[in-house]
Amino acid sequence: MAANTTSPAAPSSPGGMSLSLLPIVLLSVALAVGLPGNSFVVWSILKRMQKRTVTALLVLNLALADLAVLLTAPFFLHFLARGTWSFREMGCRLCHYVCGISMYASVLLITIMSLDRSLAVARPFMSQKVRTKAFARWVLAGIWVVSFLLAIPVLVYRTVKWNNRTLICAPNYPNKEHKVFHLLFEAITGFLLPFLAVVASYSDIGRRLQARRFRRSRRTGRLVVLIILAFAAFWLPYHLVNLVEAGRTVAGWDKNSPAGQRLRLARYVLIALAFLSSSVNPVLYACAGGGLLRSAGVGFVVKLLEGTGSEVSSTRRGGTLVQTPKDTPACPEPGPTDSFMTSSTIPESSK
């Protein structure tokens, strides 16, 4: 996470103690919930899932991205507790670079999930051909490469500097044009464009599902939608504040004015709030698992994701595409293991 974010105010600064308390609480909750939760998801997929579906690979990489950013939380907690940055400039840049990579990887993975579902509904037979693990691995590799590249500005602008007799890890822009560029670049590439693609995908899905009778469409994409909404809820305020800051910078308003100070205070909290987005997904998996959590125990993640790879056959009936899982009755009742991406999709075969 990057752009014009500065580390939360030092506890030794005026009003800093109360300001630092909420970020400390949010970071601690994110670390306590997200670190074991995402580790459990990674362990479940790598150790307990014999045949990993494309969806499982996407979820695995999303959990890895979340783990990466959560591993930086102790450094920020140390800063909040001590009131000064103790990990030199290299630590400053690396911590924020990892946060930037994680943010981009997460939003790109969520976008791919949405596009995958849209393709499966709009072009099910094409989806069957391209939705293979080999192709998915190439896509995932591309996502990580792009994420590393998009986060490079953090390495360029981040530095350690003195502020009120304390060392802070903060951006250092040569001029206001660089600041505006970085703020807008992060908001557009890290949120606006990906979520336009997500909205377009689900608008197309909704339109097509109204015209076609898909099996189990009621459960289609439930968990993916929850993941998208959670990510938007945690990151939209952060990007909105950065856009406001960019506008104020272009207008030449004083950053030390009361409004500018309130904007900085809001950003301190929103940075910590964004960390919670990396801890919420395992909670969503548990909620979406329903009865699986009770029946399958620690294997509920595997059971939840196994449904995303069930084979589906497609036929035309009266001009309408009807998809029926193989080896199941023509009109099966939705079970607890119905996938969150496979309903009305042709899953990966030939893996």
From Swiss-Prot:
Task: Provide the protein's localization.
Answer: Cell membrane
The record's Gene3D superfamilies line, in alphabetical order, gives:
Rhodopsin 7-helix transmembrane proteins
Q: What the entry says about post-translational processing?
A: Phosphorylated by GRK6 upon leukotriene B4 binding; which promotes desensitization.
The residue ranges flagged as biased composition, category Polar residues, are: 311-326, 339-351
Region called Disordered, residue ranges: 311-351
Please list the GO biological process terms of this entry: signal transduction
Tissues in which the protein is found: Highly expressed on activated leukocytes, including eosinophils.
Q: Which residues cross the membrane?
A: 22-44, 57-77, 94-115, 141-161, 180-200, 223-243, 269-289
GO MF, one annotated term: leukotriene B4 receptor activity
Question: What family is reported?
Answer: Belongs to the G-protein coupled receptor 1 family.
Which PANTHER family has this protein been placed in? CHEMOTACTIC RECEPTOR, G-PROTEIN COUPLED RECEPTORS FAMILY 1 PROFILE DOMAIN-CONTAINING PROTEIN-RELATED
Q: What is this protein called?
A: Leukotriene B4 receptor 1
Gene source species: Mus musculus
Q: Which gene encodes it?
A: Ltb4r
